[in-house]
């Protein structure tokens, strides 16, 4: 048989009749032959790999072991496997590699790219989006942007969260988190809109997402919390739980004295 027939048979193609295909595969097994996927993909000019990048420009201490990332990565891996792709994960620190996105897509290692969160890399993603089409970003949509985004309506979610606090009786709100990242800024903006309409003040209790820093910062905020604050909107569920634990340690009644709500995608 020809090399092409052998190649198609080893790949399990139906173009080769079943008897011949089975015979070739049996011979390959008896000689310990394994199909070189890398060489096969090189010939077809595809890698069979989808890259997943998590840029941490706004908080380089944040860990991928965060429950949100782990859940999302699990679903991505399941879906990619079902479609015959492998997943290549990269944690990106933009301050150490400003050209990380161009370098990644130009490496030839992936057939497409998923970016989890825009962080402070919106403009860099926009620059690449004009020439690199197989890229999808999990994040916040802004009017007129070029890159394809999948995500929740963060501003609307922020409005819902603040409305819930106000309806529960809160009259002095605080946003717990960093308002610099695009998604968090939108959540805060939604909360501010509701606070303005309700005539209640809202302040920011800044907190990072990395576990150790968040614990220290949230504990400090709770220990020095203005007694008037009776409603806290946490930028993430993890921050909300951290805040709840800190309040409980001070024997502050939740939701009796302080109401808390978290946000996650």
Regions found by a protein language model. Give the residues of each.
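An alpha-beta-alpha
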Residues: 159-205
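Short hydrophobic segments within beta-strands
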Residues: 53, 116, 138, 175-176, ...
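Short beta->alpha junction loops
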Residues: 86-96, 179, 203-213
């Amino acid at each position: 048989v020809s090399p092409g027939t052998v190649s198609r048979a080893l790949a399990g193609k139906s173009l080769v009749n079943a008897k011949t295909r089975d015979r070739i595969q049996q011979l390959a097994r008896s000689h310990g032959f394994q199909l070189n996927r890398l060489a096969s993909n090189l010939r077809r000019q595809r890698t069979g790999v989808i890259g997943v990048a998590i840029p941490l420009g706004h908080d380089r201490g944040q860990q991928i072991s965060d429950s949100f990332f782990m859940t999302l990565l699990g679903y991505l891996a399941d879906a990619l496997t079902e479609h015959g792709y492998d997943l290549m994960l990269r944690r990106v620190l933009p301050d150490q590699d400003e050209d990380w996105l161009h370098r990644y897509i130009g490496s030839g290692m992936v057939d497409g790219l998923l970016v989890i969160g825009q962080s402070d890399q919106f403009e860099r993603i926009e620059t690449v989006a004009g020439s690199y089409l197989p890229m999808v970003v999990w994040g916040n949509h802004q009017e007129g942007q070029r890159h394809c985004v999948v995500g929740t309506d963060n501003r609307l979610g922020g409005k819902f969260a603040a409305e819930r606090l106000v309806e529960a009786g809160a009259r002095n709100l605080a946003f717990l988190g960093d308002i610099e990242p695009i998604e968090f800024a939108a959540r805060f903006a939604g909360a501010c809109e509701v606070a303005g309409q309700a005539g209640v003040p809202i302040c920011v209790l800044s907190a990072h997402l990395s576990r150790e820093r968040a614990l220290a910062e949230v504990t400090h905020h709770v220990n020095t919390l203005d007694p008037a604050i009776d409603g806290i909107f946490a930028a993430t569920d993890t921050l909300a739980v951290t805040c709840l634990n800190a309040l409980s340690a001070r024997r502050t009644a939740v939701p009796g004295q302080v109401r808390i709500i978290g946000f996650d995608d």
